[in-house]
Amino acid sequence: MIGRIAGILLEKNPPHLLVDCNGVGYEIDVPMSTFYNLPQTGERVVLLTQQIVREDAHLLYGFLTPQERTTFRELLKITGIGARMALAVLSGMSVQELAQAVTMQDAARLTRLPGIGKKTAERLLLELKGKLGADLGALAGAASQSDHAADILNALVALGYSEKEGLAAIKNVPAGTGVSEGIKLALKALSKV
């Protein structure tokens, strides 16, 4: 599986990207939330990816944050939700908005997304209940302690730690700590476990 790609962004054509990785160009589909936060073409980009292997294709989906990728994976577990629809959900609302809709059981909010009818919205609410809120709450708590929580978490995940381990370690990082110092403190906390 390809879990992360770092390289030069060659093309941007929503929702498709072409990223050059040491001479190999990877086509990656991304949600619009990721697309709008990408660097300019010709610049370096790092994406967390989800690879899907089908009979007729190997597909890559990219995300800037671990939360987006985790949510994408949770959406794929739901019957009737494929990669395209999961991408549409993440393009139509942020992970935080989706978690809020799930917490409030707001089916009407989900039906505003393209391709999501009432039954699909209700299935999403049922299947995602309790799966998004805890992680987002943990990240929000960590973010209040460190201004660079997302960057530190991305670095820890890139080093092979799970998101859960990373979130627990970030709780030991004081507010106002820089990214590099925050990573050191988080790694120190992880080494004690």
Curated annotation (Swiss-Prot):
Localisation: Cytoplasm
Region (Domain I): 1-64
GO cellular component, one term: cytoplasm
One annotated GO biological process: DNA repair
UniProt-annotated stretches for the region Flexible linker: 139-143
Family: Belongs to the RuvA family.
Protein name: Holliday junction branch migration complex subunit RuvA
Organism of origin: Burkholderia ambifaria (strain ATCC BAA-244 / DSM 16087 / CCUG 44356 / LMG 19182 / AMMD)
Gene from which the chain derives: ruvA
